[in-house]
Amino acid sequence: MGLLILGIESSCDETGVALVRSIGAARPRLLAHALHSQVQMHQAYGGVVPELASRDHIRRVLPLTTQVLRASGQRLADVDVLAYTRGPGLAGALLVGAGLACALAAALGKPVLGVHHLEGHLLSPFLSADPPEFPFVALLVSGGHTQLMRVDGVGRYALLGETIDDAAGEAFDKSAKLMGLGYPGGPALARLAEQGSATAFGLPRPLLHSGDLDFSFAGLKTAVLTQVRKLGDQLPARKADLAASTEAAIVQVLVKKTLAALRQTGLRRIVVAGGVGANRRLRQQLDAACADSGLRVHYPELALCTDNGAMIALAAAMRLQAGVQQAGTDYAFDVLPRWPLAASA
């Protein structure tokens, strides 16, 4: 029967729970997952309020666990390992998932395992119908992180480049806020961009020709603010064009740096993960560039691009399979709000 692993994600504003079954060296299989997003709750504040996020995780995580067990036809007593997001993320939010996982594990006498949030994103395409093979270059791109990693196997990660200021997702969200598009801004900006011209505004592409694999998006955000102020009363009529131009600037940098990472490493496979990985323009441009060069690009299923419990259960299963980490029965836990991925290997 292999191992039945319950994964809990609570690092920010999504509460996710999932069950994965791992049998021998076979690819782990997702049995069920459930997710609650706090987007509606945080909309009134224009962003995530950490205290409210933690309280909502407390309300949601146990009912979601019950929902997943029922959907999979499993009992809590059948679970072999409990996995949770140890970091990075909001400290209070992380403590909710860690606390529940360790409490359940202690009550059941089962082992527990803390997982790196970004490793969950990085490995999430292994749940897709077209999973990648090692080694590959990973573009981890979300509201809080923008990194390029060389991935030679589970737990074998080398940082190639990262943002020196704002993450790509943050650039989407803050630009959207400047345009009055509400929260969450990234998806709203991407939808509006489909109606506009990507060449209407000559926005900067920071570090595009820097020769390294680092990113910078703070200057782009400032340029968007400048355009918003220049447009004044004309902003409503030009908003779609500004959204399209902003999206095009972010995507061009992401695509060029990712292809440069492939050239630098000599690898021919890309994994794109994180919330921004769902962006249509990013997928279209990467797919086109890879098709022209005979390269392979892999994405998670769209439903698994945002934070979710499935990626945490999967990462735990793959770490156990690879023998890079053992689940333990020391139920004293801590969380790591700041935790470089390479340091978790």
Swiss-Prot record:
Coiled coil: none annotated. One of its GO terms (biological process) is tRNA threonylcarbamoyladenosine modification. SUPFAM superfamilies: Actin-like ATPase domain. GO terms for cellular component: cytoplasm. Its main location: cytoplasm. Substrate binds at residues 140-144, 173, 186, 279. Its EC number is 2.3.1.234. Fe cation binds at residues 117, 121, 307. CDD domains: ASKHA_NBD_TsaD_bac (cd24133). It is found in: Cytoplasm. Binds 1 Fe(2+) ion per subunit. GO terms for molecular function: iron ion binding; N(6)-L-threonylcarbamoyladenine synthase activity. Keywords: Acyltransferase, Cytoplasm, Iron, Metal-binding, Transferase, tRNA processing. Its cofactor is Fe(2+). It comes from the Bacteria. It is an enzyme of class 2 (transferase). The keyword Acyltransferase applies. It catalyses: L-threonylcarbamoyladenylate + adenosine(37) in tRNA = N(6)-L-threonylcarbamoyladenosine(37) in tRNA + AMP + H(+). Required for the formation of a threonylcarbamoyl group on adenosine at position 37 (t(6)A37) in tRNAs that read codons beginning with adenine. Is involved in the transfer of the threonylcarbamoyl moiety of threonylcarbamoyl-AMP (TC-AMP) to the N6 group of A37, together with TsaE and TsaB. TsaD likely plays a direct catalytic role in this reaction. Belongs to the KAE1 / TsaD family. This is tRNA N6-adenosine threonylcarbamoyltransferase. It comes from Verminephrobacter eiseniae (strain EF01-2). The lineage of its organism: Bacteria, Pseudomonadati, Pseudomonadota, Betaproteobacteria, Burkholderiales. The gene is tsaD.
